[in-house]
């Protein structure tokens, strides 16, 4: 296997879909105590989501509670309750190029700005003839880590607290 020219630093987010966001809020916000830190709404992505935080500082994990704007349209963010996971990447453009060269299939849209303000792209849940490597049923979001996240994970890896 080739030497990987980038690092997966940690989990950036978990996205949970449901037909009714209020039911998700009951558990995640009201009972588990996650804080709603923002919202994101996109006709193109057929999503209305609350962006919540689990933990603090640069190592916090984003938990997105999502419902479709129109349950009859795609993408159907509620059809798979665990919609996707997001991974912090230290150098997203390098990662995308290298993974593409290794046969990884990406979802349409390329690198773009995500709902939380970071550059993102998605590994497709299924491989294809041209790009045989996919997420084996899981949509995986690759997220460009900001400098403070890269520094925090580097310090953690080096045993610095």
Language-model segments: residues:
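Residue-level detector of anion-binding/catalytic polar loops
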Residues: 35, 88, 105
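Conserved short beta-strand elements that form part of the metal-binding/catalytic scaffold
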Residues: 35-76, 116-146
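Amphipathic alpha-helical segments
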Residues: 20-35, 95-102
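N-terminal beta-strand motif that seeds the catalytic metal site of vicinal oxygen chelate
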Residues: 1-25, 82-89, 143-161
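Alpha-helix termination/capping residues and helix-transition junctions
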Residues: 8, 31-33, 79, 136
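A short, N-terminal "cap"/entry segment at the start of jelly-roll beta-barrel domains
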Residues: 2, 29-30, 41
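Vicinal oxygen chelate
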Residues: 2-5, 10-19, 50-55, 73-161
